[in-house]
């Protein structure tokens, strides 16, 4: 059960990291398009 809980927490952290990366990429693309 501990391993499952740890994996669940890790997945949430990864999801948040990927969400931030997605926002960063989107901003870079928008800036490039505006130029």
Swiss-Prot record:
It is an enzyme of class 5 (isomerase). One of its GO terms (biological process) is N-acetylneuraminate catabolic process. Its EC number is 5.1.3.8. Keywords: Isomerase. Pathway: Amino-sugar metabolism; N-acetylneuraminate degradation. Residues 1-21 are annotated as: Leucine-zipper. One of its GO terms (molecular function) is peptidase inhibitor activity. It catalyses: an N-acyl-D-glucosamine = an N-acyl-D-mannosamine. Homodimer. Forms a heterodimer with renin and inhibits its activity. Belongs to the N-acylglucosamine 2-epimerase family. Catalyzes the interconversion of N-acetylglucosamine to N-acetylmannosamine. Involved in the N-glycolylneuraminic acid (Neu5Gc) degradation pathway. This is N-acylglucosamine 2-epimerase. It comes from Canis lupus familiaris (Dog). The gene is RENBP.
